[in-house]
C-alpha cells in the first residue's frame, strides 16, 4: 500500500469511506528513529523457563526501561498483569525448555492473556533450540512445532505487530543481544 493510501485511509473522511467500501485499513507502522536510546520504546514482558532467558537477562535492561516477568519472583522483576500492567510493546518467550508435547500448553498460558494488553506495533519473539541439534526425536518435534505456532500467532497479532522465531544452537547464546535489538 502506498503512503498516499495510508494517509487517506487514516484520515477522518478516509476511515468512513474505507469502512463503507470494505477496503483494508492499514496501520501506521512504528519505525526506528535516530536518537532512540533503547530498541523497545515501552514495556517488555519476559516469559518461559529455559536457559536462553537466563542469557537474555544480563542485557535485558539495555532493551527497555520497563521490564516485567510473567511469573511472580522470576528474575526479581515485577509481575505483569493484564488488569494493572502497562500496554506491552514487546514479548520474549523462551521455549527452549519444552521437550514434550504436553508442555506446549505453556505457550497458550503465556500468550493468551497478553494479546489484549499489546500496544501498537508490538514485537513478539519466541526463542527455541535448533531441532536438528536435539538428540531426542520428541523434543526435536516439539521445537519444530514452534514454527507453526509462530506463523499462527503472526496472523493473529494485528495492530502492525511482528512475530519472530529464533532457533538458537548450542553456543549461540552470545549472539542473542544482537538478534533482540
What does each of the following model-derived ranges do?
Residues 1-181:
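Glycine-rich nucleotide cofactor-binding loops and adjacent beta-alpha elements
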